[in-house]
Amino acid sequence: QQIIQAIQSTSLPIVNSSFTPAEVGLSDIQLIDLFESQVMSRHLDFQSRVMQKQGQSFYTIGSAGHEGNAACALAFRPNDMAFLHYRSAAFVIQRSKQVPDQTILYDMLLSFAASSDDPISGGRHKVLGSKSLFIPPQTSTIASHLPKAVGTAFSISLSRKVAVDNVLEKDGVVMCNFGDASSNHSTAQGAFN
């Protein structure tokens, strides 16, 4: 409601950046597409709460405040491995647009409902992940994905040195994001070291 009121009254925040979308490599279409992914992420949060009130959803920790992750998804290739914080729905949505035949909104709703048809967890837990999107499943256990990201990044450089097949590109990048609570966790500290 607040965003609609702000747009209608044109009382939007003052932009402190002198860069235009074109100057950072974004077309108008890409900018609108990113915004759409962010809105979809936010509406999934709303829908999860509606489903929870109806007794149809069992996980309502949303991705509000993390919508900017959609831009990260656009910055990386869809086959760069991404180890995601459990609030990174906007990233998953944006990446799904880069890979044909994805049903990510439906899949995420199945996850919220703990449906056995959920393609990533089979109804065991709300999980962000997708094999076709190169996003290993990650639950809300904080920082547990950081060592996996380090190992995956190491495997890319190692695959260039030894004759071994790797599903990741030789010039691949491993992306990992996490929340502030993770940064003080011993698992994260081990990954940093």
Predicted regions and their residues:
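Cofactor-binding active-site loop characterized by glycine-rich and histidine/acidic residues
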Residues: H43-F46, K53-N193
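Conserved acidic/glycine
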Residues: Q1-N69, A75-F76
